Amino acid sequence: MRFKGLDLNLLVVLDALLTERTLTAAASSINLSQPAMSAAVARLRDYFNDELFTTSGRERVLTPRAETLAPAVRSALLQIQCSIISWDPFNPAQSDRRFRIILSDFATLVFFEKVVERVAREAPAVSFELLPIDDDPDELLRRGDVDFLIFPELFMSSAHPRAALFDETLVCVGCSTNKQLPRQLTFERYMSMRHVAVKFGRTLKPSIEEQFFLEHGLKRRVEIVVQAFSMIPPMVSGTARIATMPFRLVQHFKKTFPLRIIELPLPLPTFTEAVQWPALHNSDPASIWLREILLQEASRMTSPGDAKRRPRQP
């Protein structure tokens, strides 16, 4: 079918090409043979009067025209899928759907493992691809390349729907065998001690406490930067270093590392961990099903305050 001289089937080819960046991968993703893919690319180049991509070493680099077309083509195809082509009925017990989710190791360890356990019971063929924090998660959502983001609500954009999951508190942690670690920290002592800090992605996006320091013009002494919360305990253990971490995660790691919580001498805010999904997936039955599970499992979590007040077992 043609629309204003363009074979609309070529939009699918163009989207695959712009996404995969190689002819072989693009052809495979839409089940086309290599000759058919090459012929389709030639027709696209003729229609747009543009090469669309050039070769640089082993990479194919998109032309400026192709870079401009990429988001528009993906958006058009997603809109067709969500508004015109009805979503397939979803039966959890029979589905083999694979969900792609961006989340931190914090969310994985204190929350998502319960979700995985439940899904394994209710939908044994459903699978997950858990991805690290990306430099541009909003773009991945817009393109429909991921199904969900799970991280602090304050870092989420307003372009897509979201729902709050649970609140979390930040605490200061040090090694329990460090005899020089005080029971209470002054602000000056906290800022001058050697810190382990976590930053995310290739661009080293700041964590919540780092964002707080930046907004208030504060600078602490960061000795080690890691890219996951799970890397903090071994960097603190057996040293005089301290770190600032989510309370639930400290409780998790106290089972295997000699950690001690010290009260923070500054008012770091409590944050809300939330889930966000592409706006175009609002009516996707599979997405709705998993969103309900996420919210239900989050509602069963004990609040950090309750955990702090819980009496120790003799």
Curated annotation (Swiss-Prot):
Annotated DNA-binding residue span(s): 23-42
Keywords, sorted A to Z: Activator, DNA-binding, Nodulation, Repressor, Transcription, Transcription regulation
Entry-linked InterPro entries: LysR-type_TF, LysR_subst-bd, NodD_PBP2, Tscrpt_reg_HTH_LysR, WH-like_DNA-bd_sf, WH_DNA-bd_sf
Pfam family, one: HTH_1
Annotated ranges, domain HTH lysR-type: 6-63
Keyword Transcription: yes
Superkingdom of origin: Bacteria
A GO MF term: DNA-binding transcription factor activity
DNA-binding listed as a keyword: yes
Family affiliation: Belongs to the LysR transcriptional regulatory family.
Role description: NodD regulates the expression of the nodABCFE genes which encode other nodulation proteins. NodD is also a negative regulator of its own expression. Binds flavenoids as inducers.
Protein name: Nodulation protein D 1
Native species: Mesorhizobium japonicum (strain LMG 29417 / CECT 9101 / MAFF 303099)
